[in-house]
Amino acid sequence: MALKSLIEYIARSLVDHPDHVDVKEIEGEKTTILELRVAEDDLGKVIGRHGRTAKAMRTVINAAATKENKRAVLEILEADHPEGQQL
């Protein structure tokens, strides 16, 4: 699915350290989970004021996933954060 590349493109456009952007896609039968990891300095840029940027990214990927009768979940994580700990 193109969701991974879509989120990578959006995130790299927003951050100061695009080389630290990493997206992991976990596909299920009806749901796709996208784990977006960015540098600690860029976390605020990706989340946005009051979470508006994160909400907008979630809206875009859900619209794209709906075309394929799926649901998408975006988790935003700190790049150096241990695996499994969501912010």
Predicted features and spans:
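RNA-contacting regions in translation and RNA-metabolism proteins
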Residues: 1-43, 55-87
